[in-house]
Amino acid sequence: MSSLVADIGALDLTRRRRGRPDDAFGALVRSVVGQQLSTKAARTIYERLAALFGDRVPPPAELLAADEEELRAAGLSGRKTEYLRDLAGKVESGDLDLYSLHSLTDEEVANRLVSVRGLGQWTADMFLMFHLDRPDVLPVGDLGIRRAVEKAYGLPEAPPPGELLSLAAPWKPHRTLACIYLWESLESDK
């Protein structure tokens, strides 16, 4: 990892926050929109969704009241529309208190988030890393991280999650930063 950090040098971490919502609901909406899409496609659909609501992320009640056909026309799949409505419904009903998440442990945050349809461990990890700014998150299910570790460590294939946990043990308590370097290494290869 040290040679990777030396090769890449200092990172502009503020660059990674550009375009990301400041509020928890907006961050989760953006995560759902971006699932299984390229960064460019995710950004386009997210911007179309925001445009439906006056160039902002709609509050939960507005998202629940939105016309499904308009949401689909913005580029959301039927499944993602369901996920966003489940998220909005849980926030609106108080079943998911987004304001309390900052005071919970990483595991508690993840458990709360994965109770929402369409939010899995990867989404919880991204939320912890980039919205709650938690310093020691390792998204073992992220294929980009696994591929970057494969390349950086000269492995014959991407390590499975358990092996990745072992390899990443020396990075504690800064695994989030290590992951940012790993993602950056993939970008610099392009």
Question: Which stretches of residues belong to each language-model region?
Answer:
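N-terminal polyanion-binding entry modules of DNA glycosylases/AP lyases
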Residues: M1-L104, E108, S166-K190
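Catalytic DNA-binding helix-loop module of base-excision-repair DNA glycosylases/AP lyases
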Residues: V33, T105-K151, L177
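Mid-sequence acidic-hydrophobic segments that form the walls
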Residues: L52, L87-G94, R112, V116, ...
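C-terminal end-helix/capping segment
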Residues: P58, G141-A169
